[in-house]
Each structure stands twice: as C-alpha cells, then as structure tokens.
C-alpha cells in the first residue's frame, strides 16, 4: 500500500525522523492559509500523487511549463502555483503517459540546502535481509545512479537477529561523507528509520533527497513509504491513510474478491491460477507477438463466483482484444473454472476471442462443460498452443 508524501512524513516524524513543517491543502485558499501559518519567506508547493519524479514531471495542459514541485517566494506565488496544479494531470516517468490528477498539494517550509543525499530501506531478496541503501547522489533517479555509477551506491544489510546497531549508522554516515556531529545525527536518523520500517511492516522507505542544511542538520526533504498489504490487518491506523482515488479501480475491486490483479498495457487478457504460471503465460504471449493486458491470479481455491468476477475485471479494460484462460487444476478444479468461464461469458455478452487451456483435476468434465455451452470458446491443448491460438484469433478479428 502506498501513501502520499505528507502522510509518510507524518508517520516518520512520530519515530523521530527530522522533517520540515508543512500542511496539506485541497484548495488555493487553504494553501494560502497554510503558508501564512508556516511563515515565510520561502515555501515549496508540492503536488501530491502516488508517483515519483514530480519535480521533473510536466502537466498535461502545459507540457512546456513547470513541474509538480515549485518554490514560491510570496503567498501570492503559493496561490498561483496551487491554482495551476489542482485538478490538472501531472505526467512523470512513473505515471506513464496517462498521468495522475492532482487533488491535493503539500505546502512546506523552504530549506537552505547544502548537500543532497539518498537514503532508503527495503527488503533485499538476494540477502533475505532488510538493507539500507545510501548514496551521495541524492535528488536523482537512484536507478540511473546504480546503472551509471554503481560505485556510488552503498548497501548495508541488517542481521535480523541483532537488528540495527550504531555501527550500521556509522557505516552509512562515513559512506555519505558526513563529519563531526553529523555522524551521530545520522546514526539516530537511520535508527529511527529502521524502527519505523520494522514496526509498521514497510516494504520500502525512501528519502530522496536527504539533505544537509546550511546549519548542518539532516532533514528528510521527501518521503516515500510503502507498506506490505499482507500486514495491514495489524495496522488499522495505517490502512486509514489509503487514498483509493490514487489506485486503479479494477485492482481495488480485485482485492475485495481476494484476486491478485495488476493492469498492464497490452491487448491479451489473462486469467491464470498461480503467480508463476501467470508470469509464464505473460512471457509466452509476448513470445508469440502480443502483449498481456493484465496479471491475474485467481488462486488455488477460487469459486465459480470469483472466476466470474475475474472475467468481468478482464473485460472492464477497453484495450482487451482477446482472453487467454490458462488453468492447471490441482486444488483448483477444472470443472469449476469451466462453469465460471461459461457463466461470465454469458453474463457479459462476450465479444472478443476466448481461448481456454485446462489441465489437471476434472479436466475432461471441464472441457465437456465448455463444449456443451454453445459459446465460441477455443480449446487449447498446451500453453504454447493456447498463446498461438489467442494471438492468431485477435489478429483475425481485427
């Protein structure tokens, strides 16, 4: 689960992470009041969307204009900038060409920046440990830094048994070139970040940039905080921070029915049981010259109703030109899948090619149900056959 920058800062501040004063606003007048309450002479106006790269982004209605993070040197400038942001679509590297509508802004105190650094925590699958990632190249896309200058990336893995220790913080401080009192400040900063990460079941906490001010302080100038969805049941206060307007409606509907759905940009809808098989299905669709429209794992114990819901989710995407159902029945019975597919196809008046590959428990019964349905369902014998048939059917229907 993602949250907005201002929410992330509020969460981290409770753990002692240093952030600047600021306030959220939903209208230009609210923004003016926040700016007055904070006091000047400089403010930063930040668009709040669930995407990075806002400063370098551009608004759809003004592609050659300013980005989604702007400095204002008067209350009037604050209002003007907020007027230009609210209700507009901001496009960044992470939003894709569709962009995201700005529905709120964050007004923050200005800051005397001496250095910009990078600091994050994440679960490193290679080491199976929470890992601190730091760099002297803050304020930039960390992926670009890692690719072009890997020597500038510092990683420190935390042993889960001993947890965070002060020497971890000192490693980071020295790696970032901090000196004197800044070293102890960094140790406390990183320790607070680690405690928040562990207490709240975060999947990533990213501070980019972490700035050194003219006074030598360490401040989190930005904050990206993501949480493990599987742990939200024990963090009801965090779950309340969810902004569903920032999420894909189809993905939200899928979550309500315990379906794992991620929308993609292709034209072949996929319904599969098992994440590994789903990824293999997407790969083979690409191999045969098409693009998957989604990742959809119905799970091992899906009911007829859940299968019907999954089918509707796929067809809610107007870009879908064909559907491939690929089921290996172990716990999942092929006849249940077949009943769900037939019911869904009838309910939504299917008008795109449908290819179904079934294998496993009750496979013959499943095939019989589809064959007797009277629907134009194309049967496939194996995964390669299924991918080839759905791509061919889509091209012929075009």
UniProtKB/Swiss-Prot annotation:
Keyword entries, A-Z: ATP-binding, Ligase, Magnesium, Metal-binding, Nucleotide-binding, Tricarboxylic acid cycle
UniProt keyword Transport, yes or no: no
Boundaries of every ATP-grasp domain copy: 9-253
Catalytic activity: succinate + ATP + CoA = succinyl-CoA + ADP + phosphate; GTP + succinate + CoA = succinyl-CoA + GDP + phosphate
Pfam families hit by this protein: ATP-grasp_2, Ligase_CoA
PROSITE patterns registered for this protein in UniProt: ATP_GRASP, SUCCINYL_COA_LIG_3
Annotated residues for binding of Mg(2+): 208, 222
Gene Ontology MF terms: ATP binding; magnesium ion binding; succinate-CoA ligase (ADP-forming) activity; succinate-CoA ligase (GDP-forming) activity
Binding site for ATP: 46, 53-55, 108, 111, 116
Cofactor: Mg(2+)
Function: Succinyl-CoA synthetase functions in the citric acid cycle (TCA), coupling the hydrolysis of succinyl-CoA to the synthesis of either ATP or GTP and thus represents the only step of substrate-level phosphorylation in the TCA. The beta subunit provides nucleotide specificity of the enzyme and binds the substrate succinate, while the binding sites for coenzyme A and phosphate are found in the alpha subunit.
Protein name as it appears in the record: Succinate--CoA ligase [ADP-forming] subunit beta
Encoding gene per record: sucC
